[in-house]
Swiss-Prot record:
GO cellular component terms listed in the entry, alphabetical order: cytosol
Gene encoding the protein: hfq
Protein name in the entry: RNA-binding protein Hfq
GO biological process, one term: regulation of DNA-templated transcription
Family: Belongs to the Hfq family.
Domain Sm intervals: 10-70
Matches recorded under PROSITE patterns: SM
Molecular-function annotations in GO: RNA binding
CDD domains in alphabetical order: Hfq
Entry-linked Gene3D superfamilies: 2.30.30.100
Alphabetized PANTHER family for the sequence: RNA-BINDING PROTEIN HFQ
Length: 83
């Protein structure tokens, strides 16, 4: 039986999007973008910042830092313990 793949990136981004948690996105060139994640796909993140929408390519992102802890629960993806 195969284990389900946990996609931490999607779970994290989806949680900050759903809970409207402000984030700071650090880019590889040192820039910082602050705002709310409004959407994402395999290659981009849509960030709303100061009333504008920004499409940020994921390959340019080094870190996404939420303003408060993100409550991601991966308990359903854990393998059952054997007794």
């Amino acid at each position: 039986m195969t284990k389900p793949q946990i996609n931490l990136q999607d779970a994290f981004l989806n949680q900050v999007r759903k809970e409207n948690i402000p984030v700071t996105i650090f880019l590889v060139n040192g820039f910082q973008l602050k705002g709310m994640v409004r959407g994402f796909d395999n290659f981009t993140v849509i960030l709303e910042s100061e009333g504008k929408q920004l499409m940020v390519y994921k390959h340019a992102i080094s870190t996404v830092s939420p303003l408060k802890p993100v409550s991601t629960s991966f308990s359903e993806a854990k393998a059952p313990e054997k007794s």
